[in-house]
Amino acid sequence: MPVALIIDDSDANRKLARVVLRADGFETVEAATGAEGVALAMEHVPDVILMDLRLPDMDGADAARSLKADERTARIPVVALSVMPVEESGEWLVSAGFAGWLAKPIRVGTFPDQVRSYCAGG
C-alpha cells in the first residue's frame, strides 16, 4: 500500500486529498506546515510527497530543497500542488527538486492515478 505525505495548510485541501487517496488504497500522513512536513517525511519515508507551494512557514520550493538535500528523503518524488499554471512555473519547479505538478482543486476522478504515477517504483 503506497504512502502519500500531504503537506498543505488548508484543512479542506488535506481532507479532500486524504479521502480520495485512502478510498483508492493509499495510506496518508498529513502536515499543515513545511517544517512539519519535512520532519514527517524523514520519520515516515513516504512513497510520494504532495506539497502546496504556499505554506505559512516556508515556501514549498524551500521545503522541497530541504527534502532533496537529505539522503533519507532525496529519492522521494515531491509533487507540487498549486493553482499556478504549470507553464508559468515548470522550470523553477524542476530546479527546486519537484518531480511534477498537479492542479488544485484536485480532480477526484483522476487524482489517485496521477499520484500513483509518481510513487517510487510505481
Model feature map: region roles:
Residues 18, 62, 84-102, 109, ...:
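Alpha4 helix (beta4-alpha4-beta5 surface) of REC/receiver domains from two-component response regulators
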Residues 25-32, 40:
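Short hydrophobic/Thr-rich beta-strand motif most characteristic of the beta2 strand and flanking loop
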Residues 56, 74, 86:
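The feature encodes the CheY-like receiver
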